Every structure is written in structure tokens, then in C-alpha cells.
A protein has these predicted regions:
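Hydrophobic/aromatic beta-strand elements that line small-molecule binding cavities or substrate pockets
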Residues: 75, 87-92, 105, 115-121
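Hydrophobic pocket/interface hotspot
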Residues: 32, 48-49, 57, 71, ...
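A solvent-exposed, acidic/Ser-Thr-rich amphipathic alpha-helical stretch
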Residues: 45-94
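Short loop/turn motifs at secondary-structure junctions and domain boundaries
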Residues: 82-83, 110-112
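Short, low-complexity N-terminal intrinsically disordered segments enriched in polar/charged residues
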Residues: 4, 8, 17-51, 143-148
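Short beta-strand segments that buttress and anchor functional surface loops
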Residues: 101-108
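Short beta-strand edge/turn micro-motifs at domain boundaries
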Residues: 117-145
Length: 148
């Protein structure tokens, strides 16, 4: 009986979670726009991750641990020790449930910064998976087009 009750409870919890994801009326691009604005621009790391990122979040950056809690535990102190860091989002591009965010990060006002492309996979209203590439903005360039 105890096993049956446990299975029923688990089944109801999974049904509720699936219904929540199915009820999400936001498109993946809207989910990522809200997440990245709250995270990168507003610097509300915990709030952004707890609202928009699945607990089983898969991280593909080899320098970062996987999982939502691991991301929060790394990023909160990072932003706290770098209060002048600033990100501006240049563009957000979506293809189905994959969303790419091209942004410019600067550690200070006089820093040339870094160009970042984050790729996020979204299911329902949750970011499930993340890849990124980061490139320093060079002092001199071979063209005048800029990186952003």
C-alpha cells in the first residue's frame, strides 16, 4: 500500500509539472529574453535561475558544473565580487526550442570586454540546456564592422 501511495504521489507530481510546462504560453525566445534580462542585465541570479531554469539544467561549458544549483552557487559570488560587470544583449535569435543570445560583457566601463554567444534549449517555460562561446574583444581589428 505504501508503494502504491508513493507511486500515485509521484505520478500526480509529474502530471502537475508536465501540465505547468504545457500551459506555458511563452515562446522559447520570450522565455530566454526574460531569463537573460533578469540574469545578465538585472543581475538577479538566483531569481532568474529559480524562475526560468530547470533543476536538471545541463551545462556544456567545460569550466562549469551542471545543474541549476551549481550555476547559482557559482554565479552569485561571481557577480557579488564583480559589481561593475555589465552585459548588454545585442541580439536574440530563435530556431524552434533553441535560442542564441549574442551579448557584450564588460568588467568595467573602460574594459573592451568579451563577446558571448549563449545557446539555450527551452522546454515549456524552462531553460533545460546551455552551451556558450566567449571571445575577447580585440584592441585592433582587421575591419571596422565591430563585433556587435
Amino acid at each position: 500500500m505504501r508503494i502504491l501511495f508513493s507511486l500515485l504521489t509521484l505520478s500526480l507530481a509529474m502530471t502537475a509539472a508536465n501540465a505547468e510546462a504545457a500551459d506555458c504560453r511563452l515562446k522559447p525566445k520570450e522565455v530566454v529574453t526574460r531569463f537573460m534580462t533578469q540574469f545578465y542585465v538585472d543581475k538577479k541570479v538566483r531569481e532568474a535561475f529559480e524562475t526560468w531554469v530547470d533543476p536538471g539544467y545541463v551545462q556544456h561549458n567545460p569550466m562549469a558544473a551542471t545543474g541549476r544549483d551549481a550555476a547559482i552557487n557559482f554565479l552569485e559570488p561571481f557577480f557579488a565580487t564583480h559589481p561593475d560587470i555589465h552585459y548588454s544583449i545585442a541580439r536574440i535569435i530563435a530556431d524552434g526550442n533553441l535560442v542564441a543570445v549574442h551579448s557584450h560583457g564588460k568588467f568595467s566601463a573602460d574594459d573592451r570586454g568579451i563577446a558571448v554567444v549563449d545557446i539555450l534549449r527551452v522546454e515549456g517555460c524552462k531553460v533545460m540546456e546551455h552551451w556558450d562561446v566567449v571571445q575577447p574583444v580585440p584592441e585592433k581589428t582587421a575591419n571596422s564592422n565591430g563585433m556587435f
